[in-house]
Amino acid sequence: MEFDTIAAISTALGEGAIAIVRVSGEDAIEKVNRIFKGKDLTAVSSHTIHYGHIVDLDTNQVIEEVMVSIMRAPKTFTREDIVEVNCHGGLVSVNKVLQLILAQGVRLAEPGEFTKRAFLNGRIDLSQAEAVMDLIRAKTDRAMNVAINQMEGRLSKLIGRLRQEILETLAHVEVNIDYPEYDDVEEMTHRILIEKATHVQNEIEKILETSKQGKILREGIATAIIGRPNVGKSSLLNSLVQEKKAIVTDIAGTTRDVIEEYVNVRGVPLRLIDTAGIRETEDIVEQIGVERSKEMMSQADLVLIVVNYSEPLTNEDEELFRAVQGKDFIVIVNKTDLPQKIEMERVTELASEKRVITTSLIEEKGVDELEKAIADLFFEGTIESADMTYVSNARHIGLLTQARKTIGDAIAAIENGVPIDMVQIDLTRTWEILGEITGDTVHESLIDQLFSQFCLGK
């Protein structure tokens, strides 16, 4: 497949030691060579790097001192010729280099276009392409491992095997229908067809069983920290994040907005939301923060309720317990370094079967126990090995759910005595749905939509 030559800045914009301009396409080497003062890039070997300067042809002025990497097709990310110009990381210099390359008839790449070309040129499938973005956005080592496994094609191979099984079953059905007189072909009975379809259904179910943990590793657990003002919510956030992000004072109501931060808890990414203290208040700004806190609490996957060990429970405390019924929550009884005034029996009663953790955040006590409780709640204390294949992408989960339904429809039809040839419709639809995961049976509009979500230069 032939495309025009494209270029984009592949590194994050801003001041830094190095910036990279990536160029891909049939004419990439020749067009960069026009503005490169050094070796003749068209004559150098593949996968080599060369020192030189980028020159403005209009003024013959040296613009940048660079190192240029040459990678020749097909052994490149896009399976096209690729040039990467390594220059200094200032905004002006890297943009000037890009503009000089574009002036040679190169087009500015669209977001995700390099990865899109890798897909369209057959180097990776669609699920592997999506994993590239997951790797970039990974918040923990575990999330990174999930993305790498998908990039290496582990999910693709699982899906490929299932599609092959369905295809072989369809071929077997077809032969039985078209050539019933062949004695050397096994008869496709209802029993055999149910066995084959059930096996596919079970394999789809196994993959889907990893989706809850996979989605958590990919997207994180939305975790709201709630409680009355000055019970230690911001201190808890800072203890988990291990930096002073929130304002911690003795003045009630100092957290007037919602503060968010990602934190790695035993390999699980938590999207922590420190909310304004929930209480009745006349302060308009604080009221807005309180309302947003209630909204965040309703949307959270996990709620951490913080109460004060050194004060009796209030009606506001008890109202929080009632508000989180039906959600996953953990109770943190903070400030155990102060004299006890809270009734722990009442806390346990309000918490029902949920975990209650005592902490003294000022003395850094109880945080490890809290982290273990979170891991226990969502991963039963352990996370599978790095070699485990998870399905974490919402698009993949949706397609697998559809495939489970259509293969289930096929099994139900067989059990109800529907003619075997009629069952082909559901089997074929299952095969097509699974193909959408890897991009084998996907519409061009969806491809464009998926890659438009990528960052520029990737």
From Swiss-Prot:
Residues engaged in binding (6S)-5-formyl-5,6,7,8-tetrahydrofolate: R22, E84, R123, K458
Cofactor: K(+)
Described purpose of this protein according to its UniProt entry: Exhibits a very high intrinsic GTPase hydrolysis rate. Involved in the addition of a carboxymethylaminomethyl (cmnm) group at the wobble position (U34) of certain tRNAs, forming tRNA-cmnm(5)s(2)U34.
Protein name per UniProt: tRNA modification GTPase MnmE
PROSITE patterns named in the record: G_TRME (PS51709)
GO biological process, one term: tRNA wobble uridine modification
Main localization of the protein described in the UniProt heading: cytoplasm
Gene3D superfamilies the record matches: P-loop containing nucleotide triphosphate hydrolases (3.40.50.300), Probable tRNA modification gtpase trme, domain 1 (3.30.1360.120), tRNA modification GTPase MnmE domain 2 (1.20.120.430)
Binding site for Mg(2+): S234, T255
Cellular compartment(s): Cytoplasm
InterPro entries noted in UniProt: G_TrmE, GTP-bd, GTP-bd_TrmE_N, GTPase_MnmE, MnmE_dom2, MnmE_helical, P-loop_NTPase, Small_GTP-bd
Annotated TrmE-type G domain residues: 220-379
Self-association state and partner proteins as the record states: Homodimer. Heterotetramer of two MnmE and two MnmG subunits.
Molecular function terms from GO: GTP binding; GTPase activity; metal ion binding
Binding annotation for GTP: 230-235, 249-255, 274-277
Residues given in the record as K(+) binding sites: N230, T249, I251, T254
Class of the enzyme per the UniProt entry, highest EC level: hydrolase
Entry similarity comment: Belongs to the TRAFAC class TrmE-Era-EngA-EngB-Septin-like GTPase superfamily. TrmE GTPase family.
Cofactor note: Binds 1 potassium ion per subunit.
EC number(s) on file: 3.6.-.-
Annotated Gene Ontology cellular component terms: cytosol
Alphabetically ordered keywords of this record: Cytoplasm, GTP-binding, Hydrolase, Magnesium, Metal-binding, Nucleotide-binding, Potassium, tRNA processing
